Amino acid sequence: MDYIFSHLSSFKLSLRSIILAVLFSAVFYELSFSSQVFALYTPTLSASVDNTAASVNGNQVINSTNKTTEIPLNLTVNTNNRTGYTATLSAETENTALTNNNSTTGAKIDSVSTNLPLGNLPNNSWGYKFGSSTNYAPIPALSTPAQILQTSGKTNGNESNQLSIGMKLSDNLESGRYTNKLIFSILTNNYDRIAVITEGPDFNTKLKSLETTTNKIEHFKKGTVAPAVSMSTVNIDDEYSDYEIKLWLDPADKTAYYYVETEKVYLNADSSEMFFSKYGEQKIKNILDLDLSNFDTSQVTNMSSMFRGMSNLTTLNLSNFDTSQVTNMDSMLASVSNLTTIDLSSLDTSKVTDISAMFYDLSNLITLNLSNFDTSRVTNMQDMFYGMRNLTTIDLSSFDTSKVTRMRAMFYGMRNLTTLNLSSFDTSKVTDMSLMFYNMSSLTTLNLSNFDTSQVINMYSMFDSVSNLTTLDLSNFDTSKVTNMSSMFNNMTNLTSLNVSSFNTENVENMSGMFSQVQKLEHLNLSHFRTDKVTNMGSMFYQMIKLKTIDLSHFNTANVTDMSSMFSMDDNLTELDLRSFTTPKVENFGYMFASFTTDNRLTRIYTSGDWDISRAVSAGVVAPKNVLVFANRVNLVGNNGWSSSTPNNVGLEALRIDRSGAPGYFTLRP
């Protein structure tokens, strides 16, 4: 290594003066480079101290109130060294005292022996402190320099560091000149040259550029020798790589090779989309296997969409992956749909915050062991297991979900899963549960008694198409912040028992399709529902074919604009009590009470008066809007007994109390 020294001279001062010379040395490790190195990297280092000949007037210190003084120093360093630098401090010799060389009695100002605040320094002593420290430390001898600073990366221009020399004097200090010298040594930290691949999206572009209409990549691996001169290559090294990395396609064996002098190749911090094959795109879609054994992933922070869409991969070995620094695994393995098994036991997920869609559409995976997953920092689990239709069991008992805010579509389409134990889930921060269990059509039990839904805003289609579930108890649900409940229970065709007694719907704006096609439920009490903010009730109770009673006694529909198909196909109902309903804003009544068959039982609709159809009339009667409002309701009669033999032809005008000269389908019940 080379050493650079800057020697600084001392000032000669008057009686009882203290002279402190600061010597400074800057040192950098000498790096040797072979002639084949592609991107020559040369480390540089510069440093300075602003006060190289500090002096103190001892008489002034002794005559001061506290008999103490502080001498500020500013150490400035500038280096491009990628591993940073180390700064040390020591005296010039083993002598750490400020000495009076003319004294016949050996007068001196000793170094403090332990860390102390300035005011507590012993008489006639000195020390140093660095940065924000409040204590002064002993002056180190030359043989035992003190490390005052160590960094891990290059500086951003000049980096300034504050130091202070402190001392305390007494009246018995012998007159004279007291001197010593401090040496600051700045050394660049050792730097090992490495090969680093370019950022993921750039790598992806270059990998795809190798393919032609006739030449497709089927294999990916490290080449043992450099490519022939005749081979068409692309560079995939990062700008900070110390080695050139070549990538090429050998049409003979359909293999994409990369070559670099080193055995190990570091992946970029951003390794997102490295092997991403977009939906509908044919580039790199034919890759059958990836040899990743020479990849070092210890510096990677982003692995989002890393292998996404590689639908022909049947095996993927990640056993050598170091993911200890990764924060983003969004869609990492999404749509690698031919995988049947994958071993993730080596993955360290302790820093991951986004794990959304990680296993999206792994439709052929039959086993998945996540017992080692640390999810304590994860905030996003949206779409995590979306479309894993062949998985029959999953154990999430080790999951820490205390920071998760998004669980949208988390288990969407896991249609072969019969049980799901979420008893360990902490959902106290979750805001989005929409589509969470959508189309889990084989699920027969679901216990959510531990769910804290106090922060949830969106429950759209949360249980949509969970068609094998017969009972669902949500009596613990806090829905006070929910704004969207549309299709929440849609197509739960086997549900016979539903407990929503705790539901607070005061902020809900959309209830369209909420209970649509809940075909086996016979009784539904929603008397506690507050619907003041709801604007859409379209298909809310559509095709509840076994429904016999429904209590909507406190429904406020003043802001509703869409009531289309609201009670359509509810063929087991004999009467509807809609006395709380008003319709000043409704624009669409299409199919509201319609049935697709004349085999239905509805005979009476009770209201407190005629309905306002002015908005609907303005909107017009254009299919499907405002048409077939009472289709096939052949048993329905109005207040005075009026009915129509052709209910399909009855229009909006029948949304009124039946009376002489004004026939209608409503019966007055004040």
What are these model-predicted stretches?
Residues F38-D192:
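Signature of Gram-negative chaperone-usher
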